[in-house]
Curated annotation (Swiss-Prot):
It is a single-pass membrane protein. The keyword Transmembrane applies. Keywords: Membrane, Transmembrane, Transmembrane helix. It comes from the Eukaryota. Pfam families: SRTM1 (PF15872). The chain crosses the membrane at residues 43-63. It is found in: Membrane. This is Serine-rich and transmembrane domain-containing protein 1. GO terms for cellular component: intracellular membrane-bounded organelle; membrane.
Length: 107
């Protein structure tokens, strides 16, 4: 037990006063954070988050427009004075002009 075993990543030698001595393993030394891999991950995550925020903004705008369309269509009552008639103003004017033409022809 005079040589520390570096393959396990730590040594438990108590003779010289150290209880736990850590050594880098092959897995931790093979990953180099300065290689640019980590910066690529940050770029991809930032692109994903910005696209997600853009889609959320488009969804909010679409829901606002839909809310405005629904509220504007419900602000006009369904002609309560006409007893449930569903004629528009243009159709009512067209019918009244046809009646006046018919009354002029019949007299």
């Amino acid at each position: 037990m005079s040589e520390p075993d570096t393959s396990s990543g730590f040594s438990g030698s108590v003779e010289n006063g150290t209880f736990l001595e850590l050594f880098p393993t092959s897995l931790s030394t093979s990953v180099d954070p300065s290689s640019g891999h980590l910066s690529n991950v940050y770029i991809y995550v930032s692109i994903f988050l910005s696209l997600l925020a853009f889609l959320l903004l488009l969804l909010i705008i679409a829901l606002q427009r839909l809310k405005n369309i629904i509220s504007s269509s419900s602000s006009y009552p369904e002609y309560p004075s006409d007893a449930g008639s569903s004629f528009t103003n243009l159709e009512v004017c067209s019918i009244s002009s046809q009646r006046s033409t018919f009354s002029n022809l019949s007299s």
